[in-house]
Amino acid sequence: MSWIERIKSNITPTRKASIPEGVWTKCDSCGQVLYRAELERNLEVCPKCDHHMRMTARNRLHSLLDEGSLVELGSELEPKDVLKFRDSKKYKDRLASAQKETGEKDALVVMKGTLYGMPVVAAAFEFAFMGGSMGSVVGARFVRAVEQALEDNCPLICFSASGGARMQEALMSLMQMAKTSAALAKMQERGLPYISVLTDPTMGGVSASFAMLGDLNIAEPKALIGFAGPRVIEQTVREKLPPGFQRSEFLIEKGAIDMIIRRPEMRLKLASILAKLMNLPAPNPEAPREGVVVPPVPDQEPEA
């Protein structure tokens, strides 16, 4: 046996470690490779560039309300294809596909619970469900949220993320703009706070109704907020729009919104604002709250 064969016989080949799918993800803005569980702990905010990625409606509500206090409202409401609408695909098929993809029946999730011990009702849009579009069920659930806030004499918070009214429901979707706005008038009559949080994106009929009717209209950083999109506006007016047009930083500069709050700071700041509006003691930021246990980061990073 030659010397090289003797060396080769003592070499034990190693197996390549396999990384389960979904452990790592990439930031949409800076391209940084991120550990999925670490990103979830940071509320879907990139630790490198502070880009606020989209959150699911349930994750958003669970990150806002106190552990163990959440009760879902309006979950029995389901959309119906009353018009038998069809474009390139049947509406009922689009609904079935969206429900399978997201696990939600429609684009708005409503829950009541407590925020630092203070009773609140909160609603959040699921943008992955047909672009967070507003149909009759979204309108009905929002009104249910208002009614619950009135019954409990507590504030209402809504996190918007929507492309606007759902075209497959035609006038029934447009009617929700008036329906939700009329419901909010009852909150105003009672003197109960309604805080609207505009996330990326908040457009169309949602921005033209309840999303901009808050006692405070708060936005996340760099959120796209408006009625028509920038490209549509440019094609209509035949002019180039200024940089950052319709982003939350542009809107606060023009006085269209009241505040911009980073997502990791949202929970405490909302609680502080509502405590003042409701004449309640300020929340204790040191109050214990169970968090998500994040597993350790794997030693091996994914291959480029």
From Swiss-Prot:
The keyword Oxidoreductase does not apply. Residues 23-292 form the CoA carboxyltransferase N-terminal domain. GO terms for cellular component: acetate CoA-transferase complex. Residues 295-304 have a biased composition (Pro residues). Keywords: ATP-binding, Cytoplasm, Fatty acid biosynthesis, Fatty acid metabolism, Lipid biosynthesis, Lipid metabolism, Metal-binding, Nucleotide-binding, Transferase, Zinc, Zinc-finger. It is found in: Cytoplasm. Its cofactor is Zn(2+). Its main location: cytoplasm. It holds the Pfam family Zn_ribbon_ACC. Residues 284-304 are annotated as: Disordered. The keyword Transferase applies. Its EC number is 2.1.3.15. Zn(2+) binds at C27, C30, C46, C49. Binds 1 zinc ion per subunit. Pathway: Lipid metabolism; malonyl-CoA biosynthesis; malonyl-CoA from acetyl-CoA: step 1/1. It is an enzyme of class 2 (transferase). InterPro entries: AcCoA_carboxyl_beta (IPR034733), Acetyl_CoA_COase_Trfase_b_su (IPR000438), ClpP/crotonase-like_dom_sf (IPR029045), COA_CT_N (IPR011762), Znf-ACC (IPR041010). Belongs to the AccD/PCCB family. This is Acetyl-coenzyme A carboxylase carboxyl transferase subunit beta. The lineage of its organism: Bacteria, Pseudomonadati, Pseudomonadota, Gammaproteobacteria, Enterobacterales. The gene is accD.
